[in-house]
Each structure stands twice: as structure tokens, then as C-alpha cells.
């Protein structure tokens, strides 16, 4: 990608897609007949976190972003259990079916968006609907839960923490400097986005860490690990490898807000990964220099 994409290609076109019982705000840009790439944002963000990445990818892909339920212009469920990962995955498949009903799509997710992508690729529908997946900085909660149960954590017992313990742990995590240094402007929907993010965590984190599942996918997966990311958990590596038939691992010297702070690195990683799949189906492991 040596040229900047044309503005008519990069300007997003908004549409409404019916998700799992509610309406989702979906944004498309890029070349209509190109391979479709769906980008999934994390908690307390909106589709705007992908703006720069989507703009640069639009000259080679049909790029789709959307506001996860409860965020941005998408509707919110009335109950916390409406934020279960199974519902978020159903939303993602609704978007996929709406924008690319006849061809599989490529996925990429950041933070809790990556966790949603993991949930989607472990679903049976992935065999025909998902061509590849890129997870930025996050394993699945099942990977994390399995790793915390290993003998190397004999005294941790994270999955047995009482409700108050999880609250204290969550507050400590939110005080970590790298997680607090959020380099994106606040939107008018930010209070609602924050509340929705909290409900996603409440609906899923404890449940999946206490009840992790051994799962496997044939979808080619690229896991991008941010070397300087305080939220990255290297101990899950072995569990990721056991759950993925074809895994690529890409380590970057960047931080948690990779789509904002280093969008070009993200663009190159995603585009090169898809090109590698077209040329060679054997998994590799590589790092940036």
C-alpha cells in the first residue's frame, strides 16, 4: 500500500443491521467487491477506534466496522446477561451475514474486541463464514482461565475470588498507568460506552475464568502481542497454541492502544497476514525488528 486511498473509498457509509435482538450501527468503506475485513472494537470504545486503520486498509479491502451493543449508536440490551459473549458473537455473525452473505470474511479485534473474535472463531459457523482472524493483544477468556489453573499458580486461585475480590482486582487493573493512558478523545456516548463496557466484563470475566472450556478452531489466527502492553498475559501462550490449528504470532514493540498509537503497524500486520495466507498455508512465527 504505497498510495493514500481516495477519499470516496475511505469515507464510511452507515447502515443498520439487526443483531441478536437489537439494532447495530455498521459502517462500510473501501472497495465493494474486494475481500471483506470486519474490525471489532473493545469495551468503552466505539467503531471510531479503528478509523485510521480502516482508512488505510480501504484501498485494498472492503472494511467494515460497527458499534458493539451498548456502545456508540448501537442499541443496548436491558439486562447484563444480554452482554454474554455468545450474544456478542451472534451480533458479529449478523454483521457478517449482512455485509458478505456469500463469501467468508477476515476478522480483526482489539482488546475485548479480540475476545469477541475468539468467541466467534470457536463457533461452528466459523468453518464457512470466517477466512482468518487477527487478535490484537488478547487471548480468549478460556485460554486465560486455563492458564490460571496451572500448577505454576498454586496460590492464586483467581477463579475462586468472591465478588468483592473481583471488584478490588478490577479497580487495581484500571489504575495501571498503561490502561489509564487512553489516547483517544471522548465521544458524546462515552458515559453509556463506559457502562456497557462494565456490563460486558461483569457478564463474562468471572464466568469464563471460573469455567474455562477446551476449544479448537481451524480458522487461521494471527495473535499480535504488544511487548509493552500491561494487559498482555504471556502465560496463556501454550493454551492458545493448543486451541488453534494454524497460528501466526506477531510481537510488536508497542502499547495497548495499538490501533491509535501505531495504526500503520496494525495495517501492515493484517494485510501481510492475509497475503501470507494466500501464498502459503503453513503457520509461521515472526517478530518485528
Model regions and ranges:
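N-terminal targeting or regulatory segments adjacent to alpha/beta-hydrolase or S9 domains
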Residues: 1-3, 288
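N-terminal cap/lid segment of alpha/beta-hydrolase-fold proteins
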Residues: 3-23
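Flexible "cap/lid" subdomain of the alpha/beta-hydrolase fold that forms the substrate-access gate
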Residues: 10-11, 22-24, 43-49, 64, ...
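Short, flexible hinge/linker loops that cap or flank conserved catalytic cores
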Residues: 18-20, 30-32, 215-217
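Conserved HGGG/HGGXW glycine-rich cap/lid loop of the alpha/beta-hydrolase fold
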Residues: 28-73
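Residue-level detector of flexible, active-site-proximal loop/helix-junction positions
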Residues: 33, 57, 140, 254-258
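Catalytic active-site module of serine/aspartate enzymes centered on a nucleophile-bearing elbow/loop
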Residues: 245-289
